[in-house]
Amino acid sequence: LISKGRAELVVGRGSAVEAFPLFGFDLKDYDALFAEKLDLLLKVRDEEFVTWSGKFRPAMNNQPVYPRALQKKLPVWLGVGGTPASFVRAGTLGLPLMVAVIGGQTASFRPLVDLYREAGRRAGFSPDQLKVGLHSPGYVAETNEQAIADYYPGYAELWTKLGRERGWPPVTQSKFNALIAPEGVLVVGSPEHVAEKLARHSEALGGVDRFTFQMDNAGLSHQQLLRSIELIGEKLIPLIKKNA
């Protein structure tokens, strides 16, 4: 309602296992919890009066859920990482797919995206119903050099800290350079550079309908983020449309 119908949801199982004990859940129920909660979410989205029962929360009997979304059908994307079953689930349900890629090369996800499309086809959904999105850390500045200078320090600090907690090696300049290379997943650079990289990502995955940036994970200032958003709207999007 606040966004006047522009809001959409991306839902996924999540990678932060620390939340489970906070809510009194057992990590062994990781997948079952998500399957049940996704089922309830779609039920609430599609029906004003909900009758539903499950294992992990009280049942609902003809209960109304308000406020309703402004859209006739609130878009719900299924966010996935690298688990094949998650791609199959999205295809079987006919939900649009949002692939979260934070490391490696985008092309390595092509077999999983193909798995999604095949599962959707087998479930009776048409190709235009099976949308694919790509979510990745990214940042746009006036030049490649400026983007890297702005982005690298905060990115390295954050991911090195997370890595210490999870047993990952620290971020180095050479590893960062590999991630911003033509085949790497990070989308950091000038509008022209980013437009070219997004085109390569789309080709690598057999076509991408949407790309979402995660820009607030590198200690960027409010002004830097605002300018990046301006560049995306004023320069990057026109370039993408021109080359489409």
Task: Walk through the language-model features, giving the residues of each.
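Active-site-adjacent structural elements that line small-molecule/cofactor binding pockets in enzymes
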Residues: 1-244
